[in-house]
Amino acid sequence: MPGTDDVAVDVASVYSAIEKSAGLLDVTAAREVVWPVLTAFEDVLEQAVIAFRVATNARHEGDFDVRFTVPEEVDPYAVALSRSLIAKTDHPVGSLLSDIQQLCSVDTYGVDLGVKSGFKKVWVYFPAGEHETLARLTGLTSMPGSLAGNVDFFTRYGLADKVDVIGIDYRSRTMNVYFAAPSECFERETVLAMHRDIGLPSPSEQMFKFCENSFGLYTTLNWDTMEIERISYGVKTENPMTFFARLGTKVEHFVKNVPYGVDTQKMVYAAVTSSGEEYYKLQSYYRWRSVSRLNAAYIAARDKEST
Protein backbone atom coordinates (compact mmCIF):
# COMPACT_ATOMS: atom_id res chain seq x y z
CA MET A 1 0.00 0.00 0.00
CA PRO A 2 1.23 3.59 -0.56
CA GLY A 3 3.01 4.95 2.47
CA THR A 4 4.95 1.76 3.18
CA ASP A 5 8.15 0.35 1.70
CA ASP A 6 6.71 0.03 -1.81
CA VAL A 7 6.77 3.74 -2.73
CA ALA A 8 9.49 5.20 -4.93
CA VAL A 9 12.10 7.13 -2.96
CA ASP A 10 14.28 8.64 -5.67
CA VAL A 11 14.46 12.43 -5.64
CA ALA A 12 12.08 12.95 -8.55
CA SER A 13 9.40 10.65 -7.08
CA VAL A 14 9.63 12.15 -3.60
CA TYR A 15 9.48 15.67 -5.01
CA SER A 16 6.42 14.74 -7.09
CA ALA A 17 4.70 13.35 -3.98
CA ILE A 18 5.53 16.52 -2.05
CA GLU A 19 4.20 18.69 -4.85
CA LYS A 20 0.93 16.74 -5.10
CA SER A 21 0.40 16.59 -1.34
CA ALA A 22 1.10 20.29 -0.79
CA GLY A 23 -1.28 21.06 -3.63
CA LEU A 24 -4.14 19.52 -1.64
CA LEU A 25 -3.67 22.44 0.77
CA ASP A 26 -3.35 25.01 -2.03
CA VAL A 27 0.35 25.29 -1.28
CA THR A 28 2.77 25.43 -4.20
CA ALA A 29 6.09 23.75 -3.53
CA ALA A 30 9.08 25.85 -4.59
CA ARG A 31 11.24 23.48 -6.63
CA GLU A 32 14.30 25.69 -6.20
CA VAL A 33 13.90 25.32 -2.42
CA VAL A 34 12.91 21.66 -2.09
CA TRP A 35 15.03 20.00 -4.78
CA PRO A 36 18.45 21.03 -3.37
CA VAL A 37 17.54 19.57 0.04
CA LEU A 38 16.40 16.28 -1.45
CA THR A 39 19.50 15.96 -3.63
CA ALA A 40 21.77 16.78 -0.69
CA PHE A 41 20.33 13.79 1.17
CA GLU A 42 19.66 11.62 -1.88
CA ASP A 43 21.83 8.76 -0.63
CA VAL A 44 19.81 8.31 2.57
CA LEU A 45 16.29 8.50 1.13
CA GLU A 46 16.32 4.81 0.20
CA GLN A 47 16.15 3.79 3.87
CA ALA A 48 14.35 6.83 5.24
CA VAL A 49 10.97 7.26 6.84
CA ILE A 50 9.37 10.17 5.01
CA ALA A 51 6.49 12.15 6.47
CA PHE A 52 4.48 15.24 5.56
CA ARG A 53 3.32 17.76 8.14
CA VAL A 54 0.85 20.63 8.13
CA ALA A 55 -0.09 23.04 10.94
CA THR A 56 -3.30 24.99 11.46
CA ASN A 57 -1.96 28.21 12.98
CA ALA A 58 -1.43 31.47 11.10
CA ARG A 59 2.37 31.33 11.40
CA HIS A 60 2.48 28.16 9.28
CA GLU A 61 -0.16 29.29 6.79
CA GLY A 62 0.96 28.68 3.22
CA ASP A 63 3.80 26.31 4.07
CA PHE A 64 4.01 22.52 4.09
CA ASP A 65 6.72 20.54 5.86
CA VAL A 66 8.53 17.35 4.92
CA ARG A 67 10.45 15.23 7.42
CA PHE A 68 12.78 12.32 6.77
CA THR A 69 15.22 10.25 8.78
CA VAL A 70 18.99 10.31 8.40
CA PRO A 71 21.33 7.58 9.75
CA GLU A 72 23.57 8.45 12.67
CA GLU A 73 26.76 8.36 10.60
CA VAL A 74 25.57 11.36 8.54
CA ASP A 75 25.69 14.79 10.18
CA PRO A 76 22.66 16.58 8.70
CA TYR A 77 23.68 20.07 9.79
CA ALA A 78 27.15 19.63 8.29
CA VAL A 79 25.54 18.51 5.03
CA ALA A 80 23.23 21.53 5.06
CA LEU A 81 26.15 23.91 5.59
CA SER A 82 28.29 22.27 2.91
CA ARG A 83 25.44 22.53 0.38
CA SER A 84 24.59 26.13 1.36
CA LEU A 85 21.11 25.06 2.44
CA ILE A 86 21.47 27.28 5.48
CA ALA A 87 23.91 30.01 6.45
CA LYS A 88 26.59 29.43 9.05
CA THR A 89 25.91 31.34 12.26
CA ASP A 90 27.75 32.33 15.43
CA HIS A 91 24.50 31.94 17.37
CA PRO A 92 24.56 29.03 19.87
CA VAL A 93 21.97 27.21 17.74
CA GLY A 94 24.77 26.55 15.26
CA SER A 95 26.87 24.73 17.87
CA LEU A 96 24.17 22.79 19.66
CA LEU A 97 24.15 19.68 17.46
CA SER A 98 27.92 19.18 17.64
CA ASP A 99 27.84 19.67 21.40
CA ILE A 100 25.10 17.05 21.74
CA GLN A 101 27.05 14.67 19.50
CA GLN A 102 30.11 14.95 21.74
CA LEU A 103 28.09 14.28 24.89
CA CYS A 104 25.42 11.78 23.86
CA SER A 105 24.90 8.57 21.94
CA VAL A 106 22.74 9.16 18.87
CA ASP A 107 20.53 6.58 17.18
CA THR A 108 19.11 8.54 14.25
CA TYR A 109 18.61 12.06 12.97
CA GLY A 110 15.64 13.67 11.32
CA VAL A 111 15.55 16.58 8.88
CA ASP A 112 12.67 18.99 8.37
CA LEU A 113 12.25 21.15 5.30
CA GLY A 114 9.49 23.55 4.35
CA VAL A 115 8.37 23.68 0.72
CA LYS A 116 8.69 27.47 0.92
CA SER A 117 11.39 27.92 3.56
CA GLY A 118 13.76 25.02 2.79
CA PHE A 119 16.00 23.23 5.30
CA LYS A 120 15.08 24.32 8.80
CA LYS A 121 15.26 21.65 11.52
CA VAL A 122 17.33 18.73 12.72
CA TRP A 123 16.04 16.13 15.17
CA VAL A 124 18.33 14.08 17.39
CA TYR A 125 16.92 10.70 18.44
CA PHE A 126 18.65 9.05 21.36
CA PRO A 127 18.88 5.23 21.44
CA ALA A 128 15.64 3.49 22.40
CA GLY A 129 15.30 3.19 26.15
CA GLU A 130 18.40 5.31 26.80
CA HIS A 131 16.85 8.57 27.90
CA GLU A 132 19.08 11.58 28.35
CA THR A 133 18.90 13.70 31.50
CA LEU A 134 18.64 17.42 32.02
CA ALA A 135 21.53 17.18 34.47
CA ARG A 136 23.78 16.28 31.53
CA LEU A 137 22.19 18.39 28.81
CA THR A 138 22.10 21.63 30.79
CA GLY A 139 25.88 21.48 31.07
CA LEU A 140 26.27 22.19 27.36
CA THR A 141 27.38 25.78 26.75
CA SER A 142 25.23 26.06 23.61
CA MET A 143 22.05 24.88 25.35
CA PRO A 144 19.39 27.58 25.92
CA GLY A 145 19.56 28.88 29.48
CA SER A 146 15.82 28.38 29.71
CA LEU A 147 16.35 24.61 29.94
CA ALA A 148 18.40 24.93 33.12
CA GLY A 149 16.14 27.71 34.31
CA ASN A 150 13.14 25.39 34.27
CA VAL A 151 14.74 22.27 35.76
CA ASP A 152 12.52 22.53 38.84
CA PHE A 153 9.44 22.46 36.61
CA PHE A 154 10.64 19.42 34.68
CA THR A 155 11.65 17.64 37.88
CA ARG A 156 8.29 18.34 39.50
CA TYR A 157 6.51 16.44 36.74
CA GLY A 158 8.93 13.52 36.46
CA LEU A 159 10.53 14.64 33.20
CA ALA A 160 14.10 15.54 34.16
CA ASP A 161 15.55 12.12 33.28
CA LYS A 162 13.18 11.28 30.41
CA VAL A 163 14.58 13.23 27.45
CA ASP A 164 14.03 11.19 24.31
CA VAL A 165 14.47 13.57 21.38
CA ILE A 166 15.92 17.03 20.81
CA GLY A 167 14.69 19.19 17.92
CA ILE A 168 16.78 22.15 16.71
CA ASP A 169 15.04 24.80 14.59
CA TYR A 170 17.75 26.82 12.86
CA ARG A 171 15.42 29.36 11.30
CA SER A 172 13.29 30.26 14.31
CA ARG A 173 16.19 29.62 16.72
CA THR A 174 14.13 27.49 19.02
CA MET A 175 14.60 24.04 20.50
CA ASN A 176 12.11 21.27 21.24
CA VAL A 177 12.68 18.77 24.02
CA TYR A 178 10.63 15.58 23.72
CA PHE A 179 9.98 13.56 26.85
CA ALA A 180 8.91 9.98 27.53
CA ALA A 181 6.49 11.44 30.04
CA PRO A 182 4.83 9.59 32.94
CA SER A 183 1.14 8.87 32.39
CA GLU A 184 0.20 11.42 35.05
CA CYS A 185 1.35 14.19 32.72
CA PHE A 186 -1.66 13.54 30.49
CA GLU A 187 -4.27 13.71 33.23
CA ARG A 188 -6.52 16.75 33.33
CA GLU A 189 -5.31 18.21 36.63
CA THR A 190 -1.66 17.77 35.71
CA VAL A 191 -2.11 19.29 32.26
CA LEU A 192 -3.81 22.28 33.88
CA ALA A 193 -1.13 22.60 36.55
CA MET A 194 1.70 22.44 34.01
CA HIS A 195 0.18 25.22 31.94
CA ARG A 196 -0.42 27.37 34.98
CA ASP A 197 3.11 26.82 36.25
CA ILE A 198 4.64 28.32 33.12
CA GLY A 199 2.05 31.05 32.66
CA LEU A 200 0.15 29.60 29.71
CA PRO A 201 -3.64 29.90 29.35
CA SER A 202 -5.74 26.93 30.41
CA PRO A 203 -6.48 24.45 27.61
CA SER A 204 -10.00 23.99 26.29
CA GLU A 205 -12.17 21.04 27.24
CA GLN A 206 -11.46 19.57 23.84
CA MET A 207 -7.73 19.75 24.40
CA PHE A 208 -8.02 18.14 27.83
CA LYS A 209 -9.71 15.17 26.14
CA PHE A 210 -7.03 15.16 23.47
CA CYS A 211 -4.31 14.99 26.12
CA GLU A 212 -5.94 11.94 27.70
CA ASN A 213 -5.02 10.01 24.54
CA SER A 214 -1.50 11.38 24.20
CA PHE A 215 1.61 9.21 23.94
CA GLY A 216 4.13 11.97 24.64
CA LEU A 217 4.80 15.65 24.99
CA TYR A 218 7.43 18.19 24.11
CA THR A 219 8.31 21.69 25.22
CA THR A 220 9.61 24.54 23.08
CA LEU A 221 12.33 26.87 24.35
CA ASN A 222 14.57 29.59 22.92
CA TRP A 223 17.79 31.45 23.68
CA ASP A 224 16.17 34.88 24.21
CA THR A 225 13.97 34.26 27.24
CA MET A 226 13.91 32.02 30.29
CA GLU A 227 10.35 30.94 29.57
CA ILE A 228 8.94 27.73 28.15
CA GLU A 229 7.12 28.88 25.01
CA ARG A 230 4.60 26.06 24.89
CA ILE A 231 3.86 22.43 25.71
CA SER A 232 2.70 20.21 22.84
CA TYR A 233 0.99 16.83 23.11
CA GLY A 234 0.93 14.04 20.54
CA VAL A 235 -1.70 11.48 19.60
CA LYS A 236 -1.25 8.53 17.25
CA THR A 237 -4.35 7.71 15.20
CA GLU A 238 -5.51 6.18 11.93
CA ASN A 239 -8.31 8.74 11.61
CA PRO A 240 -7.37 12.19 12.93
CA MET A 241 -10.77 13.65 12.11
CA THR A 242 -12.38 11.49 14.80
CA PHE A 243 -10.69 13.64 17.44
CA PHE A 244 -11.91 17.05 16.39
CA ALA A 245 -12.92 19.27 13.52
CA ARG A 246 -10.44 22.00 14.43
CA LEU A 247 -7.97 20.77 11.89
CA GLY A 248 -9.96 22.92 9.48
CA THR A 249 -11.46 22.33 6.05
CA LYS A 250 -8.15 22.42 4.15
CA VAL A 251 -6.52 19.88 6.42
CA GLU A 252 -9.65 17.74 6.33
CA HIS A 253 -9.46 17.82 2.54
CA PHE A 254 -5.81 16.78 2.78
CA VAL A 255 -6.60 13.89 5.15
CA LYS A 256 -9.36 12.59 2.90
CA ASN A 257 -7.49 12.91 -0.37
CA VAL A 258 -3.78 12.38 0.21
CA PRO A 259 -2.94 9.19 -1.73
CA TYR A 260 0.03 8.18 0.42
CA GLY A 261 -0.05 6.34 3.71
CA VAL A 262 -3.80 5.84 3.55
CA ASP A 263 -3.73 2.89 5.94
CA THR A 264 -0.82 4.01 8.10
CA GLN A 265 -1.26 5.79 11.37
CA LYS A 266 -1.03 9.56 11.60
CA MET A 267 0.35 11.81 14.32
CA VAL A 268 -1.60 14.80 15.58
CA TYR A 269 -0.04 17.36 17.90
CA ALA A 270 -1.82 20.06 19.88
CA ALA A 271 -0.51 23.09 21.77
CA VAL A 272 -1.67 26.30 23.43
CA THR A 273 0.28 29.48 22.69
CA SER A 274 0.84 32.33 25.15
CA SER A 275 -1.98 34.24 23.44
CA GLY A 276 -4.41 31.41 24.15
CA GLU A 277 -4.53 30.12 20.57
CA GLU A 278 -4.86 26.35 20.28
CA TYR A 279 -3.38 24.92 17.15
CA TYR A 280 -2.73 21.51 15.72
CA LYS A 281 -0.19 19.76 13.54
CA LEU A 282 -0.93 16.70 11.44
CA GLN A 283 1.83 14.34 10.37
CA SER A 284 1.01 11.89 7.59
CA TYR A 285 3.43 9.35 6.14
CA TYR A 286 4.64 8.98 2.59
CA ARG A 287 6.84 6.12 3.67
CA TRP A 288 6.31 4.38 7.00
CA ARG A 289 8.86 2.09 8.57
CA SER A 290 7.89 0.81 11.99
CA VAL A 291 11.47 -0.06 12.89
CA SER A 292 12.57 3.56 12.68
CA ARG A 293 13.20 5.74 15.71
CA LEU A 294 11.12 8.44 14.03
CA ASN A 295 8.11 6.31 14.89
CA ALA A 296 9.39 4.56 17.98
CA ALA A 297 11.24 7.37 19.74
CA TYR A 298 8.42 8.56 21.92
CA ILE A 299 5.65 6.10 21.11
CA ALA A 300 6.56 3.56 23.76
CA ALA A 301 3.51 2.77 25.84
CA ARG A 302 2.96 5.87 27.92
CA ASP A 303 2.11 3.89 31.00
CA LYS A 304 5.41 2.03 30.94
CA GLU A 305 8.16 3.95 32.64
CA SER A 306 11.79 2.98 32.40
CA THR A 307 13.23 1.59 35.58
Swiss-Prot record:
Enzyme Commission no: 2.5.1.124, 2.5.1.125
Homology family: Belongs to the aromatic prenyltransferase family.
Transmembrane segments: none
Reactions catalysed, as given in the entry: 2-O,3-dimethylflaviolin + (2E)-geranyl diphosphate = 6-linalyl-2-O,3-dimethylflaviolin + diphosphate; 2-O,3-dimethylflaviolin + (2E)-geranyl diphosphate + H(+) = 7-O-geranyl-2-O,3-dimethylflaviolin + diphosphate
Keyword Cell wall biogenesis/degradation: no
Cross-referenced InterPro entries: Aro_prenylTrfase (IPR033964), Prenyltransferase_CloQ (IPR020965), PrenylTrfase-like_sf (IPR036239)
Domain of life: Bacteria
Keywords tagged on the record: Isoprene biosynthesis, Prenyltransferase, Transferase
Activity regulation info: Does not require any metal cations for activity.
Pfam families: PTase_Orf2
GO molecular function list: prenyltransferase activity; transferase activity, transferring alkyl or aryl (other than methyl) groups
Quaternary structure (record): Monomer.
Biological role: Involved in the biosynthesis of furaquinocin. Catalyzes the transfer of a geranyl group to 2-methoxy-3-methyl-flaviolin to yield 6-prenyl-2-methoxy-3-methyl-flaviolin and 7-O-geranyl-2-methoxy-3-methyl-flaviolin in a 10:1 ratio. Can also use other substrates such as flaviolin or 1,3-dihydroxy naphthalene, and can also use DMAPP as prenyl donor.
GO biological process, one term: antibiotic biosynthetic process
Class in the EC hierarchy, top level: transferase
Protein name (Swiss-Prot/TrEMBL): Furaquinocin biosynthesis prenyltransferase
